């Protein structure tokens, strides 16, 4: 049998125009960028700086902040200055709705401090004011050499365009469904706005598009269509994904399918946090998604079995949890000290069934004893058994072996 039948790999990455957002490149065959958004009142400089810093430290490469009124616009340059004093050079993206033209015009320091402007075609202006107010933002973006994201959202769709397409569809011999017309409206809203931005003098290398909806199948359909019709860089995100497990699963499925097709240049996982919850979770989920799909490496992987009736205790679970926590804690220092350590794979297994095999496939692994097994834990490094641990301090001994391995393999000294 031909072995190639079983091989699978992502489709070739869609070719898009690269866009510089500060010092971060989006599109143009660059690695997929993880970004996030604050939920603080931007006018509260202290709170916003604190959250941006936390998102940056978690791994967000771009952070979007709301700019919804004069006080928020006035705070942006202060936030930028404070972050730079703290040593954080993260590009800030301004999120504008309704009065973006006014805020950018009246607060030039804000326009200068931001690395990108997000514009929503559905509420940039209405009626005769729409094109004029859109043009004002494009003129400011051109003046300050800033890129824009034209961010269409299902929940704030351009009603004039939707009405037009609904009326045209009604005249067809075989009309599309309402859902299909809405999908087409989302796509056309993004593309028509991008075309207008180009007519107004903004280069293709200054335009990113997004077309967010809250249904997984709709999102896949919209982005697949958008990817076929243009070569602009694309920002992926499932809007209103929800809370907890549901939000993680919905976003991961939708974005994972698109990424597997080669579609997507930057992602944001939109999760509704619990009250007082950790805002950085959306960054971690985004990184995990890209890493498990093999597109990027952010952190070492710890493989651990789920446990079953063969496992005698929770020792292997506790060890796996502790090792993963230690790796996460040390990564800010290790990225500099041990280049390449993010590609490390560690296996912590609970019995003889899959333990030795999984440990051999990892860079370093341990197979703890299960029910009825000899109270010994073989350690494997790069496929070879190097030691067998016994006694009450197996966990501590393995941690020491792991630390030595990291130093020897990734240390530059």
From Swiss-Prot:
<dbReference type="InterPro" id="IPR004588">
    <property type="entry name" value="IspG_bac-typ"/>
</dbReference>
<dbReference type="GO" id="GO:0016114">
    <property type="term" value="P:terpenoid biosynthetic process"/>
</dbReference>
<dbReference type="GO" id="GO:0051539">
    <property type="term" value="F:4 iron, 4 sulfur cluster binding"/>
</dbReference>
<dbReference type="InterPro" id="IPR011005">
    <property type="entry name" value="Dihydropteroate_synth-like_sf"/>
</dbReference>
<keyword id="KW-0408">Iron</keyword>
<comment type="pathway">
    <text>Isoprenoid biosynthesis; isopentenyl diphosphate biosynthesis via DXP pathway; isopentenyl diphosphate from 1-deoxy-D-xylulose 5-phosphate: step 5/6.</text>
</comment>
<comment type="function">
    <text>Converts 2C-methyl-D-erythritol 2,4-cyclodiphosphate (ME-2,4cPP) into 1-hydroxy-2-methyl-2-(E)-butenyl 4-diphosphate.</text>
</comment>
<dbReference type="GO" id="GO:0005506">
    <property type="term" value="F:iron ion binding"/>
</dbReference>
<comment type="similarity">
    <text>Belongs to the IspG family.</text>
</comment>
<dbReference type="GO" id="GO:0141197">
    <property type="term" value="F:4-hydroxy-3-methylbut-2-enyl-diphosphate synthase activity (flavodoxin)"/>
</dbReference>
<dbReference type="GO" id="GO:0046429">
    <property type="term" value="F:4-hydroxy-3-methylbut-2-en-1-yl diphosphate synthase activity (ferredoxin)"/>
</dbReference>
<keyword id="KW-0004">4Fe-4S</keyword>
<dbReference type="Pfam" id="PF04551">
    <property type="entry name" value="GcpE"/>
</dbReference>
<keyword id="KW-0560">Oxidoreductase</keyword>
<dbReference type="GO" id="GO:0019288">
    <property type="term" value="P:isopentenyl diphosphate biosynthetic process, methylerythritol 4-phosphate pathway"/>
</dbReference>
<keyword id="KW-0411">Iron-sulfur</keyword>
<keyword id="KW-0479">Metal-binding</keyword>
<protein>
    <recommendedName>
        <fullName>4-hydroxy-3-methylbut-2-en-1-yl diphosphate synthase (flavodoxin)</fullName>
        <ecNumber>1.17.7.3</ecNumber>
    </recommendedName>
</protein>
<feature type="binding site">
    <location>
        <position position="305"/>
    </location>
    <ligand>
        <name>[4Fe-4S] cluster</name>
    </ligand>
</feature>
<keyword id="KW-0414">Isoprene biosynthesis</keyword>
<dbReference type="InterPro" id="IPR016425">
    <property type="entry name" value="IspG_bac"/>
</dbReference>
<feature type="binding site">
    <location>
        <position position="308"/>
    </location>
    <ligand>
        <name>[4Fe-4S] cluster</name>
    </ligand>
</feature>
<feature type="binding site">
    <location>
        <position position="351"/>
    </location>
    <ligand>
        <name>[4Fe-4S] cluster</name>
    </ligand>
</feature>
<dbReference type="InterPro" id="IPR045854">
    <property type="entry name" value="NO2/SO3_Rdtase_4Fe4S_sf"/>
</dbReference>
<feature type="binding site">
    <location>
        <position position="358"/>
    </location>
    <ligand>
        <name>[4Fe-4S] cluster</name>
    </ligand>
</feature>
């Amino acid at each position: 049998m031909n072995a190639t039948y079983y091989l699978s790999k992502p489709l070739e990455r869609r070719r898009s125009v690269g866009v510089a957002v500060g010092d971060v490149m989006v599109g143009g065959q660059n690695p997929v960028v993880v970004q996030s958004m604050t939920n603080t009142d931007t006018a509260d400089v202290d709170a916003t700086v604190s959250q941006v810093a936390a998102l940056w430290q978690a791994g967000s490469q771009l952070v979007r902040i709301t700019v919804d009124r004069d006080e928020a616009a006035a705070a942006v340059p202060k936030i930028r200055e404070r972050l730079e004093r703290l040593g954080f050079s993260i590009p800030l993206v301004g999120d504008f709705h309704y009065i973006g033209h006014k805020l950018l015009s009246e607060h030039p320091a804000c326009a200068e401090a931001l690395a990108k402007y997000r514009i929503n075609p559905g509420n940039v202006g209405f009626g005769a004011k729409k094109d004029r107010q859109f043009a004002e933002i494009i003129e400011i973006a051109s003046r300050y050499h800033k890129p824009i994201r034209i961010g269409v959202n299902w929940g704030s769709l351009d009603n004039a365009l939707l009405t037009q397409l609904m009326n045209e569809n009604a005249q067809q011999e075989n009309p599309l469904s309402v859902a299909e017309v809405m999908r087409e409206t989302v796509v056309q809203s993004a593309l028509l706005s991008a075309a207008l931005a180009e007519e107004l003098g903004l280069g293709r290398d200054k335009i990113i598009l997004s077309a967010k909806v809250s249904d997984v199948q709709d999102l896949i359909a919209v982005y697949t269509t958008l990817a076929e019709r243009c070569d602009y860089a694309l920002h992926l995100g499932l809007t209103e994904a929800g809370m907890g497990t549901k939000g993680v699963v919905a976003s991961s499925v939708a974005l994972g399918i698109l990424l597997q097709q080669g579609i997507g240049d930057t992602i944001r996982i939109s999760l509704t946090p619990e009250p007082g919850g950790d805002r950085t979770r959306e960054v971690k989920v985004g990184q995990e998604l890209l890493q498990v799909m093999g597109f990027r490496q952010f952190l070492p992987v710890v493989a651990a079995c789920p446990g079953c009736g063969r496992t005698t205790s929770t020792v292997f679970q506790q060890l796996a949890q502790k090792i993963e926590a230690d790796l996460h804690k040390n990564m800010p220092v290790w990225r500099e000290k041990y280049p390449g350590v993010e590609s490390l794979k560690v296996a912590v297994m609970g019995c003889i069934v899959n333990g030795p095999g999984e440990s051999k496939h990892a860079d370093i692994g341990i197979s703890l004893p299960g029910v009825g097994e000899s109270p010994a834990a073989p350690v494997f490094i790069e496929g070879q058994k190097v030691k067998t641990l016994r006694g009450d301090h197996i966990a501590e001994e393995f941690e020491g072996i792991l630390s030595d391995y990291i130093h020897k393999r990734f240390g530059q000294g």
